[in-house]
Amino acid sequence: MTLAPFAVPEYTAADFSQETWWLSLIKAVFIIVFLIANVLLALWVERRGLGRMQTRPGPNVAGPLGLFQAFADAGKLLFKEDMWTRRAERFLYFLAPAIAAFAAFSVYAVIPMGPNVTIFGHSTPMQLADMPVASLYILAIASLGLYGIVLGGWSTRSTLPLYGAVRSSAQVISYELAMGLSLVSVFLMSGSMSTSQIVAAQGQFWWAFTLFPAFVIYCISAVGEVNRLPFDLPEAEGEIVAGHMTEYSSMKFGWYYLSEYVNMLNVSAVATTMFFGGWHAPWPLSHVEFLNSGWWGLLWFFLKIWFFMFLMIWTRATLLRFRYDQFMNLGWKRLMPIALGWLVLVALVRGITQFVQLPNHVLFGGVGGLFLIALVIIWLTDKPEPEPVAASEREYTGFEDGFPVPPLPGQTPLASPRATATIEGTLATASALENPKEATDE
C-alpha cells in the first residue's frame, strides 16, 4: 500500500507463496511459547536487575540464581483461592482479563521475527501473517486491550478499580496519539504500512537514526502505553492499591499480570520493527551476508527486543512516578506538538528529496539536528512567571468540617507544639507517663 505521491522505492514484502495451514499452526504455537518464555525470563531479569541496581541480592533461593522464582510465582497464582466481590458483574468480571490477554498475544501475529527459512522443505517467513495495513492492525489491537482494563475496573463495582480504569483510559488515549504520529513518519519514509516492507526499507539505515525525534517520542509513549514507571498511575500502589486489578485474585489476576509483561514485549518488538531494522543484523555485522539470512534473524530480533526491555527495567529502577498533572501535560503539551511538528518536517523533506539528490540519512540528520536544537532553545527560554498567590480571607484553624486539612495559599500554618517545647517540659511529661501515681499525688 503506497502512502505518498513521492517516488518511494517499492520494497519487497514477505513471501507467503509456500505457506500451508500446518506451518501457520506451528508459527502460532511458537509465538505463544516465545512470549511466555520471555515473560518468565523478564520476571527473573527484572527482579535480579532491580536488586543489583538497588544494592541487594534479589531472588536467590528458588533454583540457581533464583531462576525458578517465576515458576514458583506462577504455581502460587494457579492454586490461590478464586474470589470476587458480591456486587460484581459476573460475566464481564471474568471476560475482562481474557480480553486483555488476547489483545496482548495478538500483536505478534504481524511482527516479522526473521527472513524466510526452510521448515520441512517449505520456505516460509518467520512471521505469522502480513497485510498492507499491518501497522494499523497493531495500533487497533493495542487499543482493544484497553477494553479489558476498563471492563475489569467497572465490572467489580468498586471504587479503586474504577479509578484505575479511568486513569488507564485517559493515559492510553493521551499517549497513543503521540505514538501514532511518531509512526506516521516511518510510513512516509518506507512508503508502506506493511511491517515486512518497513523492515526491508531499513536494510541500509535504521529509522532510529534517520528519524531520531520520532524514535524518542515513540519510546516515551511506549512506556506510558504499558503503564510502567514513571507512568504507572493506573496502578499506583500508594494511591489506588493496584488499580483495575485490586479486586482480582488467582489466575484472573495472573492474566492481567501476564498481559502487562507481554505488552512490554509488544512495544519492544514494534520499536525493533519500526526503528531498529527488525531482524537485520546490526552494523558492522550487517555487511556479512549470511548473518542476514536464515535463523540468524531471530537472534538479532531477540537481542534488540531485550535491549528495549532492559531500558524499561532500568527506567523503573531510576525514575520516580510522575504526578498526574505532570503526566498529562507531558503527553498533550509536549509530545503531541513535537510529534506534529516533526511529521510536517518529514513530509516537507520527503518532497524536497525529489528535487535534491541527497541521501536520506544526510538530509534528515541535518534537519533532525536543527529540530532538536530548536526544541532545546524553546525549552530553555520557556520559563513561565509564577502567578501571584492571593491571600485567603479565612483564618486557618487546622480543621475544615471536622477534618484536618493543610493551609490554603496565603494562610499561616499553626505553630507546632513541638516547636515551643523545652527539654525540661519533655522530660517532665515522660516522667509523668512512666509514674502516673506519683504525678497524681503531686
Model-based region annotation:
Residues T2-E442:
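Selective transmembrane helix interface/packing segments
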